[in-house]
Amino acid sequence: MIYLLDTDVVAELTTRARPDPRVTARFRSTAGLNRFLSVITVAEIEAGVAATPDPVRQARYARALAAVRHEYHDRIASIGGPEAAAYLAIHKTLKAAGAGIDPPDALIAATALADGWTAATRNIKHMARTGVLVINPWEEKL
């Protein structure tokens, strides 16, 4: 199974002093080559680093971001034609149902859908509505 890690998962694994053991166990049991990030996730992390007012924390987060960029340098999925088409389908479906989703979440879900991947997120409520296969590493058992 190939996982597209949502921003909350990356933050848990890289910035917490003691990441949740369920999350670390889930991804220790998964080959690194089967874990991807969306360019949207990277952008959300960059925005979070830039918005951190405490310079010490900002520096720590910037180091974590640099490590993530290094580790995933060849596994950062961009948004192309198939992802854009999946995004449009998600947007139309949810709009017709009277439900909304933040564009970053919809783009991450669209990337997973277009590539046949599983989205790993704590944000099950919003992601599941998109039709993407979703796991919550905080709840899933190995």
Protein language model regions, located:
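A generic structural signal for short hydrophobic patches within well-formed alpha-helices
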Residues: 10, 42-45, 84, 127
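General small-molecule cofactor/ligand-binding pocket signal
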Residues: 36, 77, 135
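Short, well-structured N-terminal submotif of metal-dependent ribonuclease cores
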Residues: 1-38, 50-67, 141-142
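A conserved hydrophobic position in a structured secondary element of the catalytic/binding core
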Residues: 5, 37-40, 79, 122
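Short, flexible helix/strand-to-coil boundary loops that buttress conserved ligand/catalytic motifs
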Residues: 14-17, 49, 91, 130-131, ...
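Acidic, PIN/NYN-like endoribonuclease modules and their adjacent C-terminal/linker elements
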Residues: 1-2, 109, 113-142
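Active-site neighborhoods of divalent-metal-dependent phosphate/nucleic-acid chemistry enzymes
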Residues: 47-58, 74-122
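A short helix-to-beta-strand connector/capping loop
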Residues: 31, 72-74
